[in-house]
C-alpha cells in the first residue's frame, strides 16, 4: 500500500499539506488515504512425488498451493500431460488386466480424476478450488499404475499445469 497523505474527509476531501496553517480551536479529524496495490502471488508445487514399488503400490507425498495475493484466487484449470512414454487412462481402470511395463497411469488430484485415454487431459474440477487471501489449498493426489518390472522412483511421468486467476467479485 502507498500512503497518499492526510485528508479532511474519509473519502475525497481536501489534502492537508505542510503549507496549511491550522487555526481551529476545536478538535478536528483528518483521514489517512492509502492506495492499495493488488498483488497476485501464488506458489504451486514444483513436484508431486509419486513412487511405485515392485508390488505396484503407489506412494505419494503432501503438497499445497499457497496464495500470497491480496485477494482470493481460484484454480480454474488443471491440465496433465504424460512424459517418458507413459499414457493416461481413466483413474478407475483395473490395472490387474494390463501388461507389465505397459506404462499406463490413471491420476487423481483432490476430487478430480482422469477419464480418458491419451497423452493429455484437462481435468473436470470437482470440489472447492478457491483459495482465500493468504490461504492454502491442500493437494491430495493418487494414481493407479500398470505393473512395473522394477520400481519407478526417479522418472518424470506427468507434467501438471495449474491455471489460477482472481476469484470472488
Predicted regions and their residues:
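Local beta-strand/beta-hairpin segments that build beta-sheet-rich folds
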Residues: 13-22, 116-118, 122-132
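Surface-exposed interaction patch
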Residues: 36-121
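C-terminal, structured domain-capping segment
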Residues: 36-37, 63-70, 121-169
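Conserved "repeat-terminator" motif of extracellular CCP/Sushi domains
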Residues: 15-36
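Surface-exposed interfaces of beta-sheet-rich extracellular modules
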Residues: 1-18
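Extracellular/surface recognition and adhesion modules
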Residues: 3-6, 30-32, 63
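Short beta-strand segments and strand-loop junctions that repeat across beta-rich extracellular domains
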Residues: 1-2, 31, 81, 108
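Surface-exposed loops/turns
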Residues: 24-26, 54, 133
Amino acid at each position: 500500500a502507498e500512503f497518499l497523505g492526510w485528508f479532511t474527509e474519509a473519502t475525497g476531501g481536501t489534502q492537508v499539506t505542510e503549507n496549511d496553517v491550522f487555526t481551529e480551536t476545536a478538535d478536528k479529524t483528518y483521514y489517512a488515504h492509502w492506495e492499495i496495490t493488488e498483488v497476485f502471488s501464488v506458489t504451486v508445487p514444483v513436484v508431486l512425488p509419486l513412487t511405485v514399488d515392485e508390488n505396484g503400490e503407489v506412494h505419494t507425498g503432501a503438497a499445497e498451493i499457497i496464495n500470497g495475493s491480496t485477494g482470493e484466487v481460484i484454480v480454474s484449470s488443471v491440465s496433465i500431460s504424460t512424459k517418458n512414454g507413459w499414457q493416461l487412462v481413466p483413474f478407475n481402470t483395473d490395472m490387474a488386466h494390463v501388461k507389465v511395463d505397459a506404462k499406463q497411469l490413471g491420476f487423481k488430484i483432490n476430487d478430480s480424476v482422469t477419464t480418458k485415454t491419451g497423452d493429455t487431459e484437462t481435468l473436470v474440477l470437482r470440489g472447492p478450488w478457491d483459495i482465500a487471501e493468504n490461504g492454502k489449498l491442500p493437494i491430495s493426489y493418487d494414481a493407479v499404475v500398470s505393473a512395473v518390472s522394477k520400481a519407478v522412483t526417479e522418472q518424470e511421468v506427468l507434467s501438471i499445469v495449474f491455471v489460477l486467476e482472481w476469484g470472488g467479485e
